[in-house]
Structures are given as C-alpha cells and as structure tokens.
C-alpha cells in the first residue's frame, strides 16, 4: 500500500542512489521499505578514519513529520552514542525538520563522528576522555574501528 | 543509570500521550455551535461570561486537534474555505503559492524535500478552485475530508511552517527583536518553527500572514478581567479573512455572524 511515508522513502532511496553523498550509503531491507540498513565510513583525519560503521534506520508512517529511529549496529565509542547504539543528536530529536531526508540524516551522523558534543553525553566515559585525555579517547576509538572490520 | 538511552524512553512516552489525543479528537471537527463551549467550563463564571460575549460576534466554531499544529491547521482550513468562495483572492493566492517554492529554494531550503511538500500543497490548493466548485456544501465536505486525512493535512502544515521559517529568515533583522531568550533566528527556525508539533506564538502568526499577505483575527479568551474577549488582528489595519479562537495553548476556527 502506498502511503505518504512510503512514497517519500522511495524518493529518498532514489535520490541516495542518484546523488550519493561521500562516505555514506543506505538502502531499504529486502522486504520492508520502513527498515533500512546503512553504512557510514569513518571521516578522514579523525580517529574514526577507515572504520565502516553499520546502522539501522527504522521509520514509522509518520515520517517525514517525525524522525526515524537510528541506531549503530557496529560498536561505536563516541560521547554521543549510547551503549545500545542509540544516537544523541538534536536533529533526530527536538530539532528534526521534515525537510531532512535519509541523505541528510546520514551526513549529519557522519559529522557527529568528527565533532562530538561532550556536553550532552550518551557515553560519559567517552565524553570525559574526549575532554580530558584525548590520547586515550583516540585509542579507544581506534579499537572500535578495528572491531568494525570484523563485524 | 546515566548511560541509559533516556531520549528514546522520553520519545516513547510522548508518543503514547499523542496517540491518546489522536483517538479522542479529529484533526478538524464538524461545525459546532459556540454555545457548545459551555460544556467545558461548567460553573466557571469568567469563561461563561466570555463565551456569551463571543456569541455576540460568532455563531459557529470548528475544533482542531491540540497537537501543537493547531494554529497552522486551523489557518489552512479557514483560509482555503474563504478562498474557495473568492475567485479574485484565490487566483492571487495560487500564484503566490506556486512561486513560493523557488523563493524558498533561493533562501537555501533543500530542493529535493521541499518539492515533495510543495507538490502536495499545490494539489490541495487546486482542489478548492472556486471555478471547480459549484456548491459551498460540497467544498466544506471536501475540506473536512482533506484535512482529516493525516497525509494531506500534515503536508499542508509542513509547507506553511516552511513558508513561516522562510519569512523569518528573509527578514531576520526585523524578527530578531521578537525572539525571547538567547535564540538566534536560525536556532528559533530550526527548533520552534520547522519541526511539526511545535506550538505557534505571535511571531509565527505575524510571519505567516506577512508571507501570504493575509490578515487573521484572533479572539483571545482567557482568565483576564473584564468579561470581554479581546480581538487582535495580524497585521492591524487590514480586513481579516480568517477568524480564530485562542484559548491558552490552543487555536480553533470561528465563523462570524452574518
């Protein structure tokens, strides 16, 4: 059945294929357009470089009026990523705009990897290390980058 | 505890509350007599007197769902109802709406997603062309159907929010003075205007009316003294085409006595 959410997701998918942003990719799962798999490549010149981080994106029929639920499947050590992979990012919560599409969501998460916001921590250890012991922070991040090759 | 995913817990709870409201109240109701307001304010002298005062000017109202979008939804319904009976204003509105897409893209809105909302918005606007509608009754029924279909109704609200946001950006120097707290116009647009379900304040009304070149009269009904409701026109000095009732936190549609 075609609904506004499904029609819009088809458009999002078409756009992502025709005009893919650098370093991210995503596609609906085989039998359900409401659940997508995505990959974000760790941005260059950050400790996340070379990592390939998998995510799932779950939409509801209220998309694009409400944001989807986005979650890392790969283990990610980052001040704004919860232990369960959930992401603390304003545009996925109170600053969501219906003008964002999947492409915008993925590129925003990619920038979050480069620029964490340690003041609203989802992982307090990562936030503290990021502020106080950058070397140890980078070491822990690199460990999850290596883990991402195996996943 | 700190590392629990609290955001998702809060969102889940909010969604449950929203679902309860959805089940109780349609997006836009049928016509109700103004007197039906009395049921909500039994033994409440202040409101009962104000409802009497409201009845001297208005006969009917339509309730809208209190989901934070009520101003935009009420405005769109009432204005399209007016335009459907006024060919001249309809034609100028339609061309303004048609051209607004390019204007928003120039202001930096993402073309790809904007088009989706604009297409649906224009589809709705074209349904209420006075040249296509023969009977008032048909139009009102069609409006009710359209505005109670969540897909259409919400897309219309989104597009009005984007027009409002665009106006705030275009005249940022002016609107900056009306913003309370430490928000920049940019932050305000992204946090209080573009997201669905965010309530509207005077600034939203002023910006939307200015973007669409239309005047809205809002009748304020609250606990204030005097027994009279107070009307405020946005902007002042023009003839209002849309009439809304404001009670703290909520807007409904009003129909003046003929």
From Swiss-Prot, chain A:
Active-site positions on this chain? 88
Q: Which UniProt keywords apply?
A: ATP-binding, DNA damage, DNA repair, Nucleotide-binding, Nucleus, Transferase, Ubl conjugation pathway
Gene disruption: observed consequences: Lethality during the second instar-early third instar larval stages. Mutants show defective synaptic function as a consequence of mitochondrial failure.
Q: Write down the EC number.
A: 2.3.2.23
Involved pathway(s)? Protein modification; protein ubiquitination
Which molecular-function annotation in GO is an example for this chain?
p53 binding
The protein's matches in Pfam families, at most eight in alphabetical order, are given as: UQ_con
Q: In what residue span(s) does the UBC core domain sit?
A: 4-150
Q: Single Gene Ontology BP term?
A: protein polyubiquitination
Q: Which SMART domains match?
A: UBCc
Q: Which reaction does it catalyse?
A: S-ubiquitinyl-[E1 ubiquitin-activating enzyme]-L-cysteine + [E2 ubiquitin-conjugating enzyme]-L-cysteine = [E1 ubiquitin-activating enzyme]-L-cysteine + S-ubiquitinyl-[E2 ubiquitin-conjugating enzyme]-L-cysteine
UniProt keyword Repeat present: no
Cellular compartments annotated: Nucleus
GO cellular component term of the entry, any: HULC complex
The UniProt entry, under Gene3D superfamilies, shows: Ubiquitin Conjugating Enzyme (3.10.110.10)
Q: Which PANTHER family match?
A: UBIQUITIN-CONJUGATING ENZYME E2
Q: Which family does it belong to?
A: Belongs to the ubiquitin-conjugating enzyme family.
Physiological role: E2 ubiquitin-conjugating enzyme that accepts ubiquitin from the ubiquitin-activating enzyme E1 and transfers it to a E3 ubiquitin-protein ligase. Required for postreplication repair of UV-damaged DNA. Involved in the negative regulation of the Ras/MAPK signaling pathway in the wing by acting with the putative E3 ligases poe, Kcmf1 and Ufd4 to mediate the ubiquitination and proteasomal degradation of rl/MAPK. Required for in mitophagy.
* Name of the featured protein: Ubiquitin-conjugating enzyme E2-17 kDa
Q: Which organism is it from?
A: Drosophila melanogaster
């Amino acid at each position: 059945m075609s609904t506004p959410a499904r029609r819009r997701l088809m458009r999002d998918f078409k756009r992502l294929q025709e005009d893919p942003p650098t370093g991210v990719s995503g596609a609906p799962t085989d039998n359900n357009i409401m659940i997508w798999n995505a990959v974000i490549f760790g941005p260059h010149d950050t400790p996340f470089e070379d990592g390939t981080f998998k995510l799932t994106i779950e939409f509801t029929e209220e998309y694009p009026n409400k944001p989807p639920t986005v979650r890392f499947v790969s283990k990610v050590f980052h001040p704004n990523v919860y232990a369960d992979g959930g992401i603390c990012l304003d545009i996925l919560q109170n600053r969501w705009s219906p003008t964002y599409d999947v492409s915008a969501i993925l590129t925003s998460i990619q920038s979050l990897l480069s620029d964490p916001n340690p003041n609203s921590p989802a992982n307090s250890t990562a936030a503290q290390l990021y502020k106080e012991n950058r070397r140890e922070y980078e070491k822990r991040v690199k460990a999850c980058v290596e883990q991402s090759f195996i996943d | 505890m700190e590392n629990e995913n609290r955001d998702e817990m809060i969102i889940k709870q909010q969604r449950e509350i929203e679902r309860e409201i959805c089940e109780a109240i349609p997006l836009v109701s049928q016509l109700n007599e103004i007197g039906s307001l009395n049921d909500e304010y039994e033994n409440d002298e202040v409101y009962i007197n104000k409802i009497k005062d409201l009845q001297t000017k208005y006969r009917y109202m339509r309730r809208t769902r209190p989901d934070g979008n009520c101003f935009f939804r009420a405005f769109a319904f009432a204005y399209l109802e007016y335009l459907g009976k006024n060919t001249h204003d309809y034609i100028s509105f339609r061309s303004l709406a048609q051209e607004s897409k390019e204007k928003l893209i120039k202001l930096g809105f993402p073309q790809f997603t904007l088009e989706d909302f604009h297409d649906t918005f224009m589809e709705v606007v074209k349904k209420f062309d006075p040249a296509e509608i023969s009977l008032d009754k048909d139009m009102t029924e069609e409006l009710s159907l359209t505005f109670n279909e969540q897909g259409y109704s919400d897309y219309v609200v989104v597009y009005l929010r984007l027009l409002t946001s665009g106006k705030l950006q275009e005249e940022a120097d002016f609107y900056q003075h009306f913003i309370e707290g430490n928000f920049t116009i940019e932050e305000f647009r992204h946090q209080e205007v573009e997201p669905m379900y965010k309530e509207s304040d005077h600034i939203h009304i002023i910006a939307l009316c200015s973007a669409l070149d239309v005047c809205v009269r809002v009748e304020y009904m609250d606990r204030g003294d005097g027994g009279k409701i107070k009307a405020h026109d946005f902007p002042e000095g023009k003839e209002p085409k849309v009439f809304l009732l404001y009670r703290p936190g909520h807007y409904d549609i009003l129909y003046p006595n003929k």
